[in-house]
Amino acid sequence: MAAVGSLLGRLRQSTVKATGPALRRLHTSSWRADSSRASLTRVHRQAYARLYPVLLVKQDGSTIHIRYREPRRMLAMPIDLDTLSPEERRARLRKREAQLQSRKEYEQELSDDLHVERYRQFWTRTKK
């Protein structure tokens, strides 16, 4: 009886070994594409989808590709005025003051020429 039991055990082992590779071939997905894959690798999607590739120009002229929230081609970092020579600093300040003065002139050109009586008919109720 013991001999029959051991014979059946060996028969089972040989059939399992023989059908093992065939069973593996039937399974079409790879062993890496199971449910644990997400915990082993990074998520292949951006955290913030609305970021655009932009070229960032630093103060020294070097460039870096970054992702920015607005679709632009290039961003330039502002120049530190403390690192400039006094002549360059004065020239930049003069240029900035000229731009500010032109903006003030433009704001002064806007005047209020609205005639209220001309539009009074639109907000008064008429009797029906």
UniProtKB/Swiss-Prot annotation:
One of its GO terms (molecular function) is structural constituent of ribosome. Keywords: Mitochondrion, Phosphoprotein, Ribonucleoprotein, Ribosomal protein, Transit peptide. The keyword Ribosomal protein applies. Residues 1-33 form a transit peptide. InterPro entries: Ribosomal_mL55, Ribosomal_mL55_sf. Component of the mitochondrial large ribosomal subunit (mt-LSU). Mature mammalian 55S mitochondrial ribosomes consist of a small (28S) and a large (39S) subunit. The 28S small subunit contains a 12S ribosomal RNA (12S mt-rRNA) and 30 different proteins. The 39S large subunit contains a 16S rRNA (16S mt-rRNA), a copy of mitochondrial valine transfer RNA (mt-tRNA(Val)), which plays an integral structural role, and 52 different proteins. The keyword Ribonucleoprotein applies. It is found in: Mitochondrion. The modification Phosphoserine is found at S85. This is Large ribosomal subunit protein mL55. GO terms for biological process: mitochondrial translation; translation. Disulfide bonds: none annotated. Belongs to the mitochondrion-specific ribosomal protein mL55 family. GO terms for cellular component: mitochondrial inner membrane; mitochondrial large ribosomal subunit; mitochondrion. It holds the Pfam family Mitoc_L55.
